[in-house]
Amino acid sequence: MKHPRISTKATGKLILLGEYAVLEGAPSLVAAIDRFCHVHIQKNGFSIFGLEAMNLDMPDLTFHLDESGKVILAGNSPYTSEKRTDFLIEVINYVASRYEGKIPGAYISIDTGDFFHRTSGNKFGLGSSAALTVALIRAMNEYMGRNLSADALFSEAIKAHRAGQGRLGSGVDIAASAAGGVIEYVVPGSEEDITNAIKRHKWPDGLYFTSVWTGTSASTRFMLEKVKRFRLTSPDFYHSIMDEMRSIAEDGCRAFASGDAGKFLEVVPAYLEQERKLEAACGIEIISPSHQKINDIVRNAGGVYKPSGAGGGDIGVAFCDNEETHLNIQSALQDSPYDLLDLAIVPAEKGLPISYE
């Protein structure tokens, strides 16, 4: 008997505003974008699991679950401890523990190719681990007959993601993948109470955006750990910067929610300047030379710019308020060494489809 294959996918994210300050309770703006992690799961009729994770530079794994739901690798699995593999196993451990390990054996396939440069193989920084977490949790719960609501999916995914990454990060990328569309996000008071964590927003009329890749990948973990050290060693200075960032982020969220594109464009460079203060205080490079060069190109073309996410490398986003400037920005960037990314926002209702084949 052939069992049906369950398929789902989860979006990446593009952070528009609120990086770093979101860790201290500030609101952030984030969009779900059309780069997808695809997950397929199919019952195999046995008690063992086979897992293939394309694009993650790791071998196929064979495992079973013990009574607590913990992954036990088969003796012939060519596994050595590696962050991507460890993270993936922790996510599976989390889901399996919810069912006390009583999950029938299956073949699981994961494809995160959308999140990597096709030529260099470098990661863009569009939230691949969050998308993987959301898609895998959605698929495994569907496999067990549980169709999670968006709120339940977010709650489960943020717990699993933090288990896999040592409680690092705000969860903003998980929120984008689970919710879809454009959202204003604040870190929930607890993983059990997410009632006020997400507000949905409509994209303002007359606001245009362009996404660009710096050409290099950055380590969000490294950046966050340096900021955390600054928080511990210079708490007063740290909180003075965070307070400014929070105030600017709140202004930006209000402008975005009210459809005031002009005000939002004033907020973006103000936030960038606070990121400059933060990087100088922490000894990190948020606005790397590549980000600075892109910023100069965008400003000369009439727009505003900031890194999207932790900075250092990865992605940046340019904004403007008219189509002519939007085209000028794109033309100028096409003549630069940097890669334009054709990203579109995925509406909430289209972000997490389930299909049976």
For each feature predicted by the language model, list its residue ranges.
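A glycine-rich phosphate/pyrophosphate-binding beta-strand-loop-alpha-helix module
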Residues: 122
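Short Gly/Ser/Thr- and Asp/Glu-enriched loop/turn motifs at secondary-structure junctions
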Residues: 309-314
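DPxDG-like acidic metal-binding loop motif
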Residues: 125-146
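A general secondary-structure junction signal
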Residues: 110-114
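Single, functionally critical "micro-switch" positions that shape active/binding sites
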Residues: 128, 172, 308
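Residues at or immediately flanking beta-strands
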Residues: 105-107
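C-terminal nucleotide
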Residues: 1-17, 22, 30-102, 116-119, ...
